[in-house]
Amino acid sequence: MEFNHVSVLLNETVDSVVTNPDGIYVDCTLGGAGHAHAVGERLSSQGMIIGLDQDEDALSVARQRLSDLKCQVLTIPTNFSNLKEALRNAGIYEVDGFIFDLGVSSYQLDTPERGFSYMNDGPLDMRMDKEAPLTAEEVVNEYDAEALLQIIRDYGEERWAKRIVEFIVNARQEKRITTTGELVRIIKNAIPAKARQDGPHPAKRTFQAIRIEVNRELAILHDSFVDAVSMLKPKGKIGVITFHSLEDRITKQTFKELSTACICPPELPMCVCNHKAVVKAKNKAIEPSAGEIEVNPRARSAKLRVAVKL
């Protein structure tokens, strides 16, 4: 199986997170194992790299790619929202570092039958876990107009959301929308020609929004980061790579919450929350170099945020 995927901010992530060659590191979004393999190359035979992924296609390729490492390797078929339970079931209670790469893999984007791509026609699917019940086809055809509007406006930050929803609703009344190509044509018709001349592909934001809804991507981030930090050893690190402002905002806010000693309302005269800071977060996100963006244009919007367990 061909699984071409260029890992974003590879060296920056590994340099930021890996500090102990004998440590245990978890790649929570294993994918094609680009980050995991680079981490594994830094580890001794006593070290361990653990990869989590809900996509069986990715796991199959990753296991093969990681087979040449001298460190211990464990892959677990699960979504990172289950990371604490999955790791404990594997006998792991403390971890030296976590990596989250929140982007969709190039393999998923470039495989039409997975339904993520607005560049190639395929079934409206978009499930990262192919056994999950909700598909993009169901979202597009069965959600009411108000729910669709909220998803495309909030998750896609699409200025033409209302018009796009109107066109989707009109189209599905005539015929069920079943392919990515059909949806792309509807979106293009909804967005005025002048607005389509500049910027990214006109369907990019809507596809992003539907993908986030199908996979509950934003809903699980905060709690997953908190779970990961709770399992970090002192001085262990968590690195999160985001690709759009919604993910980055949640990451930044969660790190701020975890690095703040008191979260009481400012009007209270004294602290009553007993909240303790558990991490120190780097203030500035790390972004790709111009050279990396030239080689891999998909890296353009990537940001890496890192926090250290106190």
Protein language model regions, located:
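S-adenosyl-L-methionine-dependent methyltransferase catalytic core, i.e., the SAM/SAH-binding region
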Residues: 1-310
